[in-house]
């Protein structure tokens, strides 16, 4: 791939798709709209963190997972995002051990994730792409790779699950498997 490509037209199309997503979100019931927008807007930030799991109290103080179940259903059903739930026992029958209070939220399209992550830099989009192609932009590439894997798994008909193991000795998770 040549490093002098102009990605302005492609990025403009992707930004238009993101605007259409936002317009669609604005059409849903008011009781869900704020939560859906909050999650949608936070997807790039959530994925760029080491701990990618959604922490609901960080969205709104005192909130919890059950208050957002319709939100994730709407985003997933509209194919904007792919949800990934904790599985307490990585064994046969993953859905039996599904814990819906722990969720990761991936974008349904990794190319859109990149534009969504840099949506405040609309005037600099060609510069951003040039820096990416020349390996000069400091971004969390892991979030892109992880999102690609999530997108591929869903495209092949798989539900997304992750696993963590809490160590009582270390007082933290000592094992995490992103996809099982």
Where are these regions (language model features)?
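A cross-kingdom feature that marks ATP-driven nucleic-acid transaction machinery
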Residues: 70-180
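Conserved helicase/translocase motor-coupling segment
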Residues: 1-77
């Amino acid at each position: 791939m040549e490093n002098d490509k102009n990605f302005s037209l492609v990025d403009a199309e992707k930004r238009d798709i993101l605007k259409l997503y936002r317009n669609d979100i604005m059409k849903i019931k008011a009781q869900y709209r704020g939560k859906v927008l909050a999650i949608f807007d936070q997807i790039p930030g959530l994925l760029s963190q080491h701990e990618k799991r959604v922490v609901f109290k960080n969205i709104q103080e005192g909130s919890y997972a059950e208050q957002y179940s319709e939100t994730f259903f709407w985003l997933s059903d509209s194919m904007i995002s792919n949800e990934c739930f904790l599985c307490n026992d990585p064994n046969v029958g993953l859905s039996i051990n599904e814990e819906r209070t722990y969720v990761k939220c991936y974008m349904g399209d990794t190319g859109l994730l990149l534009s969504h992550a840099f949506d405040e830099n609309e005037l600099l989009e060609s510069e951003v792409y040039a820096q990416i192609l020349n390996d000069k932009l400091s971004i969390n590439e892991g979030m892109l790779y992880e999102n690609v894997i999530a997108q591929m798994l869903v495209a092949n008909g798989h539900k997304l699950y992750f696993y963590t193991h809490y160590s009582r000795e270390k007082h933290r998770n000592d094992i995490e498997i992103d996809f099982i």
